[in-house]
Amino acid sequence: MTQPEPLVITLLGPTASGKTALSLEIAERLNLPVINVDSRQLYREMTVGTAKPTAEQRARVPHHLLDLRNPDQPITLQEFQAEAEPCIQRELQSRGMALLVGGSGLYLKALTSGLKPPAVPPQAQLREQLSQLGQAICHPLLQQADPTAGAKIAPADAVRTQRALEVLYATGRPMSSQATATPPPWRVLELGLDPANLRQRIQQRTDQLYSDGLVEETRQLSERYGADLPLLQTIGYGEALQLLEGTMNQAKANRITTQRTRQFAKRQRTWFRRQHQPHWLAPATELDQAMTLIEQHLR
């Protein structure tokens, strides 16, 4: 009798949907570590602004693929896959299962469908030029040159915008036309969270970020890596930086962070519904539902 392929469980959902709390419960039930698939949590020193699992949570359940690089060392999708795939394989070999958790849709899609992005090494000089141009110019440029990539990449996502332009410059072809896919040797069970009160949860998340020290973390990052660090233009950090520079007050920073987060969550929802087929878990009973689905897939 043929042995079934090992099982990869993915827990996905928009930001502030409760993935961290549920992932800890599932991980403890199954005695599994959590494999991070949140693109900003890959970077060191970005803890508060990315709502990275706390030291207490990481002591409770081991986490992989956190704090891989310094913030001034961008990680390409291909580099992330090179780190993530062996990590998944190790868990599958030792435990027969792996648990992926995150809201970065493209990163999840790459791991679950075997998407292979073009193998283009980083172009340091080009990245410097693009940083000098600024995201306000670079993203419209990408939309013109590669409309497919431009539609998928958020206007404030300088890291992925630069990467798409980098591939276009190096190969002469849009990044969106070069990706191929080879299905990985494992089964995938996708579990999704999308609570009805997400707007309220996002406001609470924003309040928590600022009370937990987002502004101080931003100040330290700016002093160490420079205010032009692309990751300091992402949600939360961009507003905290303007607050530090005196161009925005606290009330406006809070409001804009909440607004940008809600816009981002809307894009995440669209991506997950178009690119994935998760079992959407109902609030209040999500843990029981998740465990039932997992047990069914293990039979």
UniProtKB/Swiss-Prot annotation:
Question: Which reaction does this chain catalyze?
Answer: adenosine(37) in tRNA + dimethylallyl diphosphate = N(6)-dimethylallyladenosine(37) in tRNA + diphosphate
Region named Interaction with substrate tRNA:
38-41
For ATP, which residues are the binding ones? G13, P14, T15, A16, S17, G18, K19, T20
Highest taxon above the source species: Bacteria
Cofactor section: Mg(2+)
As one GO molecular function, the record gives: tRNA dimethylallyltransferase activity
Task: Tell me which UniProt keywords the record has, alphabetically.
Answer: ATP-binding, Magnesium, Nucleotide-binding, Transferase, tRNA processing
List residue numbers at the site (Interaction with substrate tRNA): S104
Q: What is its EC number?
A: 2.5.1.75
Q: Where does substrate bind?
A: T15, A16, S17, G18, K19, T20
Database matches in InterPro entries: Dimethylallyltransferase, IPT, P-loop_NTPase
Q: List the disulfide bonds.
A: none
Role summary: Catalyzes the transfer of a dimethylallyl group onto the adenine at position 37 in tRNAs that read codons beginning with uridine, leading to the formation of N6-(dimethylallyl)adenosine (i(6)A).
This protein's name: tRNA dimethylallyltransferase
